[in-house]
């Protein structure tokens, strides 16, 4: 082995693998491969330590250590990572859906991977593969998205644009407490219950056709012998390969079936014709099926060992499949539990909303009943009361500070009379509000609940001079105006009075704000722009007696 290659390889191993035991295992596997020269076993053993996407570059680093004759087989057995992104477009409204299942997300500590494809479905038809990592959806990177956020992003458009790169691994996490693990696509049992055997052990590799190119110029011959197969297995097979020969160099082995040479089909040729074709040219393009007739040239001991080996492999594969299916079963149970939990949460929320609606209806009914009772009890008495007894003066609202803030009794002008007080109230009830405002565009019917909701635009001239009280955490349960001071922008506007509920400030709903949060939002809005928009629920007009003091 070239020292520079070995040094670079060790450096990459140290960089990608921190665990010393795993490093030792990797070097032991490579030493055993150079003794047995079994590529399939090597790749199967490597997959046990190259078990996450960040370690996949090790396959490329190991490739220079593989003899030339085994590199084609090595490339076939190792996952083919794609560095380039592939973009496809899927119709979200297709009757059969997108045709894929995905795993992963930010909450699992990994990206989003395709774990299952419906055969001949949309995703399968456009060339997506199990083990593809989804990088972008509709132009947005999903590297910091949870699983649910990605699903919601897919639902935003009719045509879904997906960019993927092939990794060849799938994330597996059976429970929240279990660390994240990865499985190769050929080892993964999909949600449909099917699975494919791993290519990582001998005997599991399917017979695959491959081509070799041989130039006989300057050589003594191929260095192999051929023979015809029996009646039950016709064809031309390689019966012997001379060590160190040209055939051995290109990877031909005993038991390989020759299916074509220089475009001539060997399936119906007899032994003599096959020999003539092989000797007819100094440049040969040979198509073979590796190992197709290996059992024809095995000894009894080799056959017995092969049977034992296959049985061990079968048991191992069955165990892997059972483990994979059990993992999927646990995942499906967890998904069902999560769906049930969300369903219960939604049901409780609906029940809570219904209970709140009934309570509010009951409160409204009780308030209406109380109002009617009050009118019945006091309305008739007011009609019988002599006008001469109403000799009290009107107590006006303090012009600069509310009564409880001044700490002194307000002064009354003896010239004020009952009619003057009535005019004062009439001016106060005048509201300047924006017409055409639809409160249902901002609030739910439960939030409005019969209120007279208006949009006011207050020009910023001087100070607002508006005091608030209450808040969602107070007995009042809402933010209301406690005072409107004379000379302020609110008083000059004329559309805000004490008792009005503040529902929104500059488009921001404050029905669930505390007093401190509402005051901060009001101050922030007042410091921005030339106007401030306030959405208020108008305080119901007070009874006339509330504005009078009797002596």
From Swiss-Prot:
Source domain of life: Eukaryota
Region feature Mediates interaction with MYO7B, mapped onto this chain: 194-532
GO biological process, one term: regulation of microvillus length
Residue numbers of Phosphoserine PTMs: 219
Coiled coil: 318-377
Residues annotated as domain PDZ: 87-169, 211-293, 452-536
Location of this chain's protein in the cell: Cytoplasm, Cytosol; Cytoplasm, Cytoskeleton; Cell projection, Microvillus
UniProt keyword annotations, A-Z: Cell projection, Coiled coil, Cytoplasm, Cytoskeleton, Differentiation, Hearing, Phosphoprotein, Repeat
Keyword Secreted: no
Compositionally biased tracts (Acidic residues): 408-419
Region (Disordered): 401-425
Stretches the record annotates as N-terminal domain: 1-86
InterPro entries linked: Harmonin_N (IPR030237), PDZ (IPR001478), PDZ_sf (IPR036034), USH2_Complex_Protein (IPR051844)
Entry-linked CDD domains: harmonin_N, PDZ1_harmonin, PDZ2_harmonin, PDZ3_harmonin
Calcium listed as a keyword: no
Signal peptide positions (record): none
GO cellular component: brush border; cilium; cytoskeleton; cytosol; microvillus; photoreceptor inner segment; plasma membrane; stereocilia ankle link complex
Primary subcellular site in the record, as a coarse category: cytoplasm
Gene3D superfamilies: 1.20.1160.20, 2.30.42.10
Subunit comment: Part of the IMAC/intermicrovillar adhesion complex/intermicrovillar tip-link complex composed of ANKS4B, MYO7B, USH1C, CDHR2 and CDHR5. Part of a complex composed of USH1C, USH1G and MYO7A. Interacts with F-actin. Interacts with USH2A. Interacts with SLC4A7. Interacts (via PDZ1 domain) with the C-terminus of USHBP1. Interacts (via N-terminus and PDZ 2 domain) with CDH23. Interacts with USH1G. Interacts with MYO7B. Interacts with CDHR2 and CDHR5; may mediate their interaction with MYO7B at the microvilli tip. Interacts (via PDZ 1 domain) with ANKS4B. Interacts (via PDZ 1 domain) with DOCK4.
Protein function: Anchoring/scaffolding protein that is a part of the functional network formed by USH1C, USH1G, CDH23 and MYO7A that mediates mechanotransduction in cochlear hair cells. Required for normal development and maintenance of cochlear hair cell bundles. As part of the intermicrovillar adhesion complex/IMAC plays a role in brush border differentiation, controlling microvilli organization and length. Probably plays a central regulatory role in the assembly of the complex, recruiting CDHR2, CDHR5 and MYO7B to the microvilli tips.
Domain notes: The PDZ 1 domain mediates interaction with ANKS4B, USHBP1, USH1G, SLC4A7. The N-terminal region constitutes an independently folded domain that has structural similarity with the CCM2 C-terminus, despite very low sequence similarity.
Official protein name in the record: Harmonin
Organism: Bos taurus (Bovine)
